[in-house]
Amino acid sequence: MDLGPNQAIKTLRDGASWHGGDHKWSLPVAQPNGTYAPGEWTPNVAPSICNAGWHLTTQPALWWSHEGNVAAYLAEYVGATSAREGEDKIAVERCRLLRPLSKGELESCGIFTDGEHEVKTGSVYASGSASVTAYGSASV
């Protein structure tokens, strides 16, 4: 999935953080025309990766689960950021959720909930009726 400038992904369970926090997020609201009204901006927090700030990812499959009501959202952020070289996550000062990811976007990020899929590189998450064929040194 191609992300724009100052965009990343947030995975939530039942609309709340669940990897080291329990913040209840302001979720995007579906509009009659098929678009989404973004959620509210989070409060400002000085970011420090793994310690403080609003944590987002570029690889939601690493933060996914088949347990509970898990969803991934496109997020935009502003302000200071904190990250470690080569990691899949970033801590940001302030962000908001723009919309849920589509099934196709989830699949492009390696999250499969049904169907048959081939994976040649990277990390993926398969659940439900999905099946995945791995190639090379990959394993399922």
Residues covered by each model-derived region:
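Short, glycine-biased loop/turn motifs at secondary-structure junctions and
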Residues: 1-139
